[in-house]
Amino acid sequence: MPKANTAPPSGVERILRPEPLILRGSTLFEGDALTVLRRLPSGSVRCVVTSPPYWGLRDYGIEEQIGLEVTMPQFLHRLVAIFAEVKRVLTDDGTLWLNIGDGYTSGNRGYRAPDKKNPARAMDVRPDTPVGLKPKDLMGIPWRLAFALQDDGWYLRSDIVWNKPNAMPESVKDRPARSHEFLFMFTKSEKYFYDWQAAREPADGGGLRNRRSVWNVNTKPFAGAHFTTFPPELIRPCIHASTEPGDYVLDPFFGSGTVGLVCQDENRQYVGIELNPEYVTLAADRLQGQNSNVIRIAAA
């Protein structure tokens, strides 16, 4: 009687023991970011481009997901721990580009605009107003995280304003409608690789100039996702400035895999980490046919 086939699906490797992970080309890891990062080799990636989940916005029903912490300090503390491992994995001359969204306190009110496409994923109520803030305060999460990472040893080198010309309108009447987010540039060391010429932008009078700190980039929805994805044109200058062809680029919150797509376009290797199996499938489909490895990592 032939033996039953117990091998994992083609292209998928199941790793159950916490052994070191060796990078052999572009790879997508399904698992918790901190668990996977702790097993990656030190100094193995040249650049990190990522956008962590917002705090208290959506519940995807995934255990250990980022963004469901009870308090804002817990959320920030957890991200600082993750980026401490990111720093270890980064080369000494490497760079981190970090985008994270902000929000307003709400006094525990329900959301005004639920996720109509995926109502089960919308949080029923916003988190409680953080200690020290008032209802309707802008929480300042991007800068709180930036300063926390700076305190943890990162070099904060630049704050880029991501201006969204096609930003979704807000119904507010008591403040300006938001149309920007921040993209922070951090480095591991005082001296680092930065190819300013590769990241130049068009100058008003013609020619090219050193890229400025306000980037006008439209949001770009992806038909296969229920969320607005990281725009490729926000990612591309980061990769141009901080890597050379063949370098590894890490995104520990891989989502639908846009960082991976840009890496393929620019002849870079990507390392993606994503906890949500639905997103892993989505990203793998987008990267199909590009010799990407998908590895599932069991929880520690």
UniProtKB/Swiss-Prot annotation:
GO terms for molecular function: DNA binding; N-methyltransferase activity; site-specific DNA-methyltransferase (cytosine-N4-specific) activity. Its EC number is 2.1.1.113. Pfam families: N6_N4_Mtase. Residues 112-127 have a biased composition (Basic and acidic residues). InterPro entries: DNA_methylase_N4/N6, MeTrfase_CN4_CS, RM_Methyltransferase, SAM-dependent_MTases_sf. Transmembrane segments: none annotated. One of its GO terms (cellular component) is cytoplasm. Disulfide bonds: none annotated. Belongs to the N(4)/N(6)-methyltransferase family. N(4) subfamily. This is Type II methyltransferase M.XycI.
